Amino acid sequence: MSKFTEAELEYIQSQRLGRLATVNKNGDPQVAAVTFRYNPELDTIDIGGYDNGNTQKFRNVALNGKASFLIDDVLPPWKPRTLEIRGHAEALSEGGETVRSGFSPHLIRITPRRIIFADTTVDPPQHSKRNV
């Protein structure tokens, strides 16, 4: 059984771009726009890139194993949706090409520990926060 609700999974699978926040060895935050996919076999978010293994975000994850991932959009006239996933992150040397053809083999994998979801496109609006 997934840690994500049906509505959250539908939202994740409708999006292609997210924002990954990590912290370097000095405690400085870094955020990057990233391409991702939901991995149903592991119930994780997998993040890839063309040169993922040589990025600051990859080094940050390898260093401390922490990340926050955000997907958001706004539908007209002003209906925002957001999904934040906080969790354990792994810097892996294989699997990146499963996110998108042509990506490097290096992969960042996030296993959710906390999920925060808001969807104002439905009536009544949905808002939830939970540890998983």
Predicted regions and their residues:
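Hydrophobic residues positioned within well-ordered beta-strands of beta-sheet architectures
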Residues: 32-34, 85, 108
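Short, structured beta-strand-loop surface elements
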Residues: 51-106
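Short beta-strand segments
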Residues: 16-50, 69
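Short, basic/aromatic recognition patches
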Residues: 1-19
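A structural signal for short, well-ordered beta-strand segments
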Residues: 36, 87-89, 112
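Short beta-strand segments in beta-sandwich/barrel cores
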Residues: 18, 67, 89-90, 114-117
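C-terminal edge-of-domain segments
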Residues: 80, 94-132
